Every structure is written in C-alpha cells, then in structure tokens.
C-alpha cells in the first residue's frame, strides 16, 4: 500500500482502520498524513479553531505501542483520527464554543463521547469551527473565523457545524463529531456532500456537550460514508448515568444495518415521502436530485408512498420559540463570575456585580447569540409564557403525533435535507429569517426526538452538493441506515464512484510521503 498522503486520507475511516489491522499503516502515519493536509488546506478552508497535533501524535503512539501484538482483535475504527466540534469539551484542549466569552477556557474533564473515543483508540486531531454556541446555519457567526465550503470557497459550508463538515469534506479528517439542535450536522452535510447523522434524542450522551437547547441538542457523526457514521455511532452511543435524558438501552445494530443495506435489496420496505417538505421554496436542482434518488429507492424494491405530516409547517415557528427560550436559560451561566471572560465596567461606572455581568456579556456574546437570548427571554417573560412558549410546546406535541401516525404507515420517512445548495458569504447575514429557513426540513426531527440522517444525493446544476434526508422512528436508528447505505451504493454506481471524485482539492496537490 502506498503511504502517499493523498492516498491515505482519501480512504474511508473503515478502510483506514482495516489498513491498521493489516499492518499496512500505523495510527501515527494516519495522524501525520492528516496533519499535513490540515496544514495545506487550512489557509483556504479554515475548518479548525484548534489543531491538537502533539496530542494526536501522542495518542497515536500510545495506541500503536499497545496494539502492536494483537491487531486482529482491535475494535473497528481503532487508531483512526477524528475531529471534534468545539461545542464538546475536551480535557486539556481549549474549548470555546466559537465564542469570545469562553476564549482560553481549558476544560478539566472530557465529555462522555470523548472518553469513549479515547477508549476506542481514536486520536483527536483538533477542535472544529462553528457558529457561536451552535447558533446559526452558515458558520458565519463564529467569533474567530469563517469556515469555507471545499466545493466552492466563496460559499458557506452550512451550520452550525460547518467546521466538522468541511474538515471531513476536505480530507483534513476521515470522520468527525458534531452536535445537532435543529440541523447543525445534517444541513452542513447536505451543503458539503458529507454524511451527517442526528441520533435519537438520548441515544448519545450529552454530558460534556455545551448546552444550547437541552431538549433538542444531540451529538452525532460526520463522515464520508454511511458505514463510517454507523461505526462511530455505535462507539459513542449507549446509556450514561451522568446524562438524565440518556436512554437506558445500548446502541442499536446500525453497523449491521448499513452493511445489509449495501447489498441494495429494499424489497418489503415502505418509504414515506413527506409531502409538506418540498415544492415551493426548494431549489429546482435540489428537487431534481431528490427525485432521481427516490427513483433509485424504487428500483431497489422499496415502496415509496406520499405521507402527510400536517403540522410540520409550523415546526419552524415552534422551534424559534422553544430553542431561544432554552438558549436564554442555558447561557445565563456565562456571567464572568466563575470562568471564561470577565470585563469590568470602565472608570466612572459603579463597580458592581450586575455591571460586570452586563459588560462581560456585551463583550463576550455575538449579535446572533444576543438576538436569541432576547427572543427567548421575551417568550419566557410573565404574561407571554403561555401565549408563546406554551403554545410552541403544544405545536411540538402535534408534530410528534404526526410522526407517530406516519410511522404507522411506513418504515422510514424521506425529504430533501436543505431547500438549497450552499449560498455565498454574506448573502443571508442581514436577513435572519432567510437564514432560519435553511433548517426547515431538519428541525422537525429535533422537535420530535427522531433519528435523522443526510447523505449526498449528487450535484445540483450549480455543481454543488445536494442532501437527501432519512428520518426513522425513535430508538430505531438502524432503520434509516439500511436504505441510506443502499441509496449511497446505488447513486455511486451511477456516478462511477463517490461524489468526492468531482471535488477539486488543490490543497492535496503535491502532498507526498
């Protein structure tokens, strides 16, 4: 096997793990290869807020020494490096949530998912960029830098997790972790051509995930293949007593489902096309690729029927009341008193705790975070709570009931992931409502706690990736992995290879041994 950098990094995570098991490559060599790509790509991609190269190499060396004798017994993905969204705490590595208010904060503990990655022998390449506190759909709201889409560096990678998606798409990392509150894994997945998964709410521990909206947040995988996401989800999933919302049962058989799906036999599967998610407001190229992918599902034996979720049209409005309300509550802890940024009042202003908090939050939070705190505080205020927050929760219940009724008819639901392909920087920054609409197809699964996944459906007429979304019943994540893997295989047959064959990667040119 060639050790050339470009050859190594273009392997899937599963292929990299297999190469380690065979003795063709070491974990250190994989880390070194990805660090080379990061060095070459970051000037144009800017996916990482912090590259932890020394830490990754140390972890890789420890893994290589420990696994030298019995490689055959290694768990899947062992030794494969990973990137982490900077919304997940990492012991000894600065964690900022892309906010100035947490600049310089080094956590004294690991999130549960990080503990599991370390136990699996997966070196951490670094922390990836995001919209501040995961609040945004373009990664333009980071306090530090703007991440660029590898398919067109003048366009956004989606958000909030554009850093993890771009890092995986640009071959800076074979796999990554993100968080998904209203589509923050899946929408960037659609815009960058990656596979993005939001597990069932409670299926992956949130302990150590910086809270944005606690009833919606979920950690999940970002990868280039469906199988890689399944492998990673089985590693990070399972019950955690430190998370009160954690589901008692262990991970579902997602890897087996993905491998079964790759056989491309969907006979007996009923697929529901959500009629409310499509048509007006969806880019023609998105609709075209989605329709072609639906035909592929039919060709493999799936029965595709149209289903109605009549209250799904209210999901955007309900979400943008519930989410800011929880943001307002969760972000109240950033007050300059305990950790993070502290800004004292200027001379002439009383040096009180209240003034210190006000000046700290004014300096530490960006415009979008402040906007959502204000919206949430208003929705929770006396006299408005029932009219706004209470009503939104009632709508949420109706959406959950819509999904339950739909799943009485079908096994899995489908829709486009995002109404458009990647848009140019600045195009929607002055219009928050236009930005919020990017998540119209992803938000319903978060409100209902359902597992959902986006996979590449091809390139639109503008040459940019389109996402195809699967939604499965709660605690049945494996149900979406089978058709997703089948569709991935069928589409790649038609493309004569993975979507990555069409991606121009000048940062890989000239990278050798």
UniProtKB/Swiss-Prot annotation:
One of the record's GO cellular component terms: glutamyl-tRNA(Gln) amidotransferase complex
Enzyme Commission code: 6.3.5.7
Active-site positions on this chain: 85, 160, 184
Keyword flag Protein biosynthesis: yes
A GO MF term: ATP binding
Gene3D superfamilies: Amidase signature (AS) domain (3.90.1300.10)
Superkingdom: Bacteria
InterPro entries listed in its UniProt record: Amidase, Amidase_CS, Amidase_dom, AS_sf, GatA
Record's keyword terms, sorted: ATP-binding, Ligase, Nucleotide-binding, Protein biosynthesis
Disulfide bonds: none
PROSITE patterns from the UniProt entry: AMIDASES
Pfam assignment, any one: Amidase
Catalytic activity: L-glutamyl-tRNA(Gln) + L-glutamine + ATP + H2O = L-glutaminyl-tRNA(Gln) + L-glutamate + ADP + phosphate + H(+)
Any GO BP: translation
Protein family: Belongs to the amidase family. GatA subfamily.
Assembly and interaction partners: Heterotrimer of A, B and C subunits.
Function description: Allows the formation of correctly charged Gln-tRNA(Gln) through the transamidation of misacylated Glu-tRNA(Gln) in organisms which lack glutaminyl-tRNA synthetase. The reaction takes place in the presence of glutamine and ATP through an activated gamma-phospho-Glu-tRNA(Gln).
UniProt-listed HAMAP family: GatA
Name of the protein this chain belongs to: Glutamyl-tRNA(Gln) amidotransferase subunit A
């Amino acid at each position: 096997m060639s050790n050339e950098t470009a050859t190594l990094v273009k392997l899937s995570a599963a292929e990299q793990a297999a190469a380690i098991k065979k003795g063709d490559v070491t974990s250190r060599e994989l880390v070194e290869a990805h660090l080379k790509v990061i060095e070459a790509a970051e000037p144009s991609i800017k996916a990482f807020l912090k590259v932890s190269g020394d830490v990754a190499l140390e972890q890789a060396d420890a893994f290589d020494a420990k696994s030298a004798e019995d490689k055959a017994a290694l768990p899947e993905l062992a030794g494969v490096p990973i990137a982490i969204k900077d919304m997940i705490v990492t012991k000894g590595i600065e964690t900022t949530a892309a906010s100035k208010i947490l600049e310089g904060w080094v956590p004294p503990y690991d999130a549960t998912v990080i503990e599991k990655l370390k136990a699996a022998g997966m070196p951490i390449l670094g922390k990836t960029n995001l919209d501040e506190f995961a609040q945004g759909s373009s990664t333009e709201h980071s306090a530090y830098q703007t991440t660029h889409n590898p398919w067109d560096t003048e366009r956004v990678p989606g958000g909030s997790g554009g850093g993890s998606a771009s890092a995986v798409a640009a071959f800076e990392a074979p796999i990554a972790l993100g968080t998904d509150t209203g589509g923050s894994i899946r929408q960037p997945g659609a815009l960058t051509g990656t596979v993005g998964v939001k597990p069932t709410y409670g299926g992956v521990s949130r302990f150590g995930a910086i809270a944005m909206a606690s009833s919606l947040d979920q950690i999940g995988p970002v990868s280039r293949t469906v199988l890689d996401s399944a492998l990673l989800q089985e590693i990070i999933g399972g019950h955690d007593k430190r998370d009160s919302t954690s589901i008692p049962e262990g991970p579902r058989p997602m890897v087996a489902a993905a491998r079964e799906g790759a056989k491309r036999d969907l006979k007996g599967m009923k697929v529901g096309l959500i009629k409310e998610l499509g048509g007006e407001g969806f880019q023609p190229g998105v609709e075209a690729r989605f329709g072609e992918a639906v035909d592929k599902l039919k060709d493999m034996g799936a029965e595709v029927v149209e289903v109605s979720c009549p209250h799904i049209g209210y999901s955007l409005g309900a979400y943008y009341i519930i989410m800011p309300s929880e943001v307002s509550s969760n972000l109240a802890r950033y007050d300059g008193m305990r950790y993070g940024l502290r800004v004292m009042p200027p001379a002439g202003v009383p040096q009180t705790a209240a003034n210190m908090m006000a000046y700290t939050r004014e300096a530490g939070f960006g415009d979008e975070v402040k906007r959502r705190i204000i919206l949430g505080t208003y929705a929770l205020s006396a006299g408005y709570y029932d009219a706004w927050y209470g009503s939104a929760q009632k709508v949420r219940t109706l959406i959950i009931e819509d999904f339950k009724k739909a799943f009485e008819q079908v096994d899995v639901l489908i829709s486009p992931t995002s109404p458009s392909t990647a848009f140019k920087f600045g195009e929607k920054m002055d219009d928050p409502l236009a930005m919020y609409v990017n998540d119209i197809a992803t938000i319903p699964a978060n409100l209902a706690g359902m597992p959902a996944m986006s996979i590449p459906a091809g390139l639109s007429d503008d040459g940019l990736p389109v996402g195809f979304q699967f939604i499965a019943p709660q605690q049945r994540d494996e149900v979406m992995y089978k058709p997703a893997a089948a569709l991935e295989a069928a589409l790649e047959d038609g493309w004569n290879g993975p979507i990555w064959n069409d991606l121009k990667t000048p940062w890989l040119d000239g990278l050798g041994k």
